[in-house]
């Protein structure tokens, strides 16, 4: 009986955790690398694909979050895209480092020519 109750409680708890919705943050950064590239398609398409194929519950409304803001810690997943140059101040780099070390996930989509710039910043 106790075993059944424990299994039932674990099932209820896990179904609650996995049914929660969360929002993905779109990373706003400096350097002229147009962080807003494909604003209307890139992240919305990724969210739609995940919700449809993986049965996730990602909020389709994307939130814009600045790399140096404490708000970055409100998002378990942040998406970064653009073309070309990426520049982080020391404070922004430190904030992003803390976010990643705390378990945050950064998805970098090299939309075109961003690779060599982002590697020096990371």
Language model features: what each stretch is:
Residues 18-77, 81-84:
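Aromatic-Pro/Gly-enriched surface loop or interdomain linker
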């Amino acid at each position: 009986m106790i075993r059944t109750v424990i299994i039932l409680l674990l099932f209820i708890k896990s179904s609650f955790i996995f049914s929660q919705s969360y929002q993905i943050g779109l990373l706003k950064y400096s350097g002229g690398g147009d962080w807003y590239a494909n604003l209307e398609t890139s992240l919305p398409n990724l969210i739609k694909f995940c919700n449809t194929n993986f049965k996730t519950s990602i909020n389709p409304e994307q939130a814009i979050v600045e790399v140096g803001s404490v708000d970055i810690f409100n998002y378990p997943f942040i998406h970064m895209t653009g073309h070309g140059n990426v520049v982080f101040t020391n404070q922004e780099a430190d904030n992003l480092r803390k976010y990643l070390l705390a378990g945050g996930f950064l998805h970098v989509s090299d939309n075109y020519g961003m690779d060599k710039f982002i590697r020096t910043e990371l």
